[in-house]
Amino acid sequence: MRQKTLDVLDFDKIKAQVENEAVSDLGRVKAAAMTPASDYETVVFQMNETDELSQIYNKHRLPSLSGLTEVKPLIHRAKIGSILNVRELNQIKRLIQVQNQYKTFYSQLLEEEEAINYPILDERMAQLPILTDLYQEIHQKCDAYDLFDDASHELQSIRSRIHSTSQRIKQNLDRIVKSQSNQKKLSDAIITVRNDRHVIPVKAEYRQDFNGIVHDQSSSGQTLYIEPSAVVEMNNKISRLRNDEKVEVERILSVLSGEVAAEADACLIAESVMGQIDFLTAKARYGQSIKGTKPEFTEERNVYLPKAFHPLLDRATVVANTIEFAEDIQTVIITGPNTGGKTVTLKTLGLIIVMAQSGLLIPALDGSKLSVFDNVYCDIGDEQSIEQSLSTFSSHMKNIVEILKHADHNSLILFDELGAGTDPSEGAALAMSILDHVQKLGSLVMATTHYPELKAYSYNREGVMNASVEFDVNILSPTYKLLMGVPGRSNAFEISSKLGLSGNIIREAKSLIGQDEQEINNMIASLETNAKKVEDQRIELDRLLREAKQVHGDLNKKYEQYQNYEKQLMDDAKVKANQRVKAATKEADDIIKDLRHMRDEKNAEVKEHELIEKRKHLDEQYEGTDIKQNVKKQKWDEIQAGDEVKVLTYGQKGEVLEILDDDEAVVQMGIIKMKLPIADLEKKKKAQEKPAKTVSRTNRSAVKMELDLRGYRYEEAITALDQYLDQAMLSNYENVYIIHGKGTGALQKAVQQHLKKHKNVASFRTGMPSEGGFGVTVAELK
């Protein structure tokens, strides 16, 4: 987009405000470089990216980005072998710290807001590298000012020796300065440092009383700073140790710089992502400051800005207006009084387009719709009049000529006072001709004018709409309200009357302009009133429609969640019911086999109370279980005496002995004879029965599907596990749950090692999170 357009629309002032919202140099650089895009995909992406972070910013307290600085030059120096100092290493450490804090914050955010998606920020966060090791290396070896003494054993040893030697020097010098005989010879009883050497201040006249080296003197020459001979060698030792310290510090910094170089690419990625995060946060803060909203971009041509206002004007006094190009409208012509807000309306439209295509939230109500323009062209300047020089008209015309050379169907053109600065009749003719030409190009145009001829222009052209800025004749002042679809009207008679002009003069003037002109003015006045009502109603309807869509979407989502939940419950219930039916059927079969075995045993004595007890046990296995719903029933009239049937309620085979009149039959099940409803019987083909073996059963209801071994010692746990697996096999369980807890993992390992060797275990696995996770092992039985 042309820089001239951005300058005219004051986009630099918007950029400066966004830049002020950034915390780091990285964010400020990106804000200063912000320019509008013209590619549809890019524009939509930038807006969505800003909107995602704005949603988070408006609901949460974001991690601090303070202290974030550009590290790219430091990374480059490290890569070529330069040694970074402690301050520079801390800049890299702060970058890593900031990115780690943001990753943690974002992870927690996603856990709290599972139903909300931030796809662009997801991708940004996924790009952030893992730099924990580099952070720890820097963090453990230095603070913000210097290396720690324990950054290496050698450095610790050197600094320890420096400290002990310094203490010895101070002890020696303390004895000298505190000696009674030396009190009058010293300028002050202190120990000081000159040229990195410990010295004492001696009066010049007592120089001969102190053996040593003079390192400095006072400005008056009356005090000499002498290093006594007794500490010269110790000071020399400290100098040597200081050199050793410098070498060791340089070595450590070199190692740390090498580690930075090894992670150079990762550090640059972190810098890029966190710089973008700061830039987006600045956009979000700015958007909140203007109560900005996210517009909807459409690929077809569309401009609808409900209650839009200029973001650089005082929010407390600025008048918001709805700006719209209806579906079939290509040109909007605004008429109205001077200083009535026409130029501000042009700039508002142009600036909002530029802001939106730069990824900034716009100063308008929710529901805005915008096209993406390749270019915005402006001819906006101070108001012109025919008294002004021809050079002013020429400069405007030169600008218009340049615009017409480059404009196309995907351009927005803003003309302020089109055709002004020359003879009114010629200016109006030029304006209409220019608008005709631009309409052929297909550009979207908004123009302001004083010429009354252009009011009629819209009625003679398709795709052209009138608009006007309102003037309040009661207070003789413009209201700055834009009325779309309503041409401006002359208020000369009303203004003159308010100012005290004679009514006779006004009536005579009205008679001179003709009845048609008066009727047109009256019609325009009526249109103004109706237009304001319609606009307010439309904005309210748009709001209600958005709310209805939001509610509809929420209800659809909740209904979908309910359906999924219901389906899950049904699926779980079916699985549990099938398992229960299968187990109950197996249990019943085994009980009947036991009864038959008791009957067939030569020496067995089957008493009536035992049969009743066994039958009661059989009934208990199926209490509350409705198997009939899951089995296809046989028609009643097909069952006859002598048929072999399956009793659906008990899942057992039997033989029909007799059909009764009241839809019941007498059925022999093994040694039990029962009267049952025919509807509970299913006809089976007769088959020779194999002799059954006696099986000792465990009452399944007494065996749980889980075994809790928490708190058991190893031997106790294995014994309990073996006993439980035997009982589970007899209960015909397919899967069982062994609860061993997490702890140290020793019990889990022991259980799984034992399950590997157990003859009745087909396989096993660690529990899912919903089953208890690592604290549970699920075993599948053979």
Swiss-Prot record:
Homodimer. Binds to stalled ribosomes, contacting rRNA. Keywords: ATP-binding, DNA-binding, Endonuclease, Hydrolase, Nuclease, Nucleotide-binding, RNA-binding, rRNA-binding. Pfam families: MSSS, MutS_V, Smr. Belongs to the DNA mismatch repair MutS family. MutS2 subfamily. It is an enzyme of class 3 (hydrolase). It comes from Staphylococcus carnosus (strain TM300). Signal peptide: none annotated. It comes from the Bacteria. Residues 707-782 form the Smr domain. ATP binds at G336, P337, N338, T339, G340, G341, K342, T343. This is Endonuclease MutS2. Its EC number is 3.1.-.-, 3.6.4.-. GO terms for biological process: mismatch repair; negative regulation of DNA recombination; rescue of stalled ribosome. The gene is mutS2.
